[in-house]
Swiss-Prot record:
Protein's gene: aroE
Binding of shikimate, residues: S14, E15, S16, T61, N86, D101, Y213
Organism phylogeny: Bacteria, Bacillati, Bacillota, Clostridia, Eubacteriales
Role according to the record: Involved in the biosynthesis of the chorismate, which leads to the biosynthesis of aromatic amino acids. Catalyzes the reversible NADPH linked reduction of 3-dehydroshikimate (DHSA) to yield shikimate (SA).
Annotated TM spans: none
Protein name: Shikimate dehydrogenase (NADP(+))
Amino acid sequence: MYTTGLIGKNINYSESPEIHNNYYKKNNIPFFYKIFNLKQDQIDDFIKNLHKNNIKGFNVTIPYKETILQYLNDIVYPADKIGAVNTVAVQEDKLIGYNTDYIGFIKSLQYYNIQVKNFKCLIIGSGGSAKCIYYALKELNARDICIVSRNPEKARLKFEKKVKILNIKDENKLDRYDLIVNCTPIGGPNFKEQKPIELKEIKKNCVVYDLNYTPKRSKLLKEAKENGAFIINGEKMLIFQAYSAIGLWCLNGIKGGR
């Protein structure tokens, strides 16, 4: 039996163990999935003991999607371009990084039949998830992508020079956007009573996507719905990225073995 899991900070709310373990059981995969709540100074020991603990792969969430890069031997496209990894496969002598969030986001849009070609898009946040969503929207030929951040100067170091980056306090013309994506933890399980931005005026039929999936309808999504938006939470993205990660681990684990 191989161990897989999720590393992050304050992540006991995660639905990943249920999704993964149900899939393993249904498909007779000899894996088990668990939560690894880690402080940053515990990551070194976690990595050193991967083989000892029979860990074949793991997912990475807030706030370590960029931190994990320093531990990897190889980073597979598009994770190398994005600069963030959320899935790691453990081989005999290598750690291979992937970004299955990228795949999960694109598949979730396909699931809801949302075509973002020529869309004007607003990304809230500038961390690893935001970078992933930015490159996914570029791949899907979104016409214009703007990023808002609490720290735009720091955010500019993470993105292409041509990307429009604004202070979140200065962006109040939301009716120009066809798609708004929240890539911050604000509104999620650790910040349920907060919103990352006010949605006072949004375009009719705007799509508002909150990557948080707990609660199912965040304060941001509730306000968006009241203003006529089509709303999506991060649950389908979570499921699709999980299945993609499992495929990578099975390829390395069951077929490659140790």
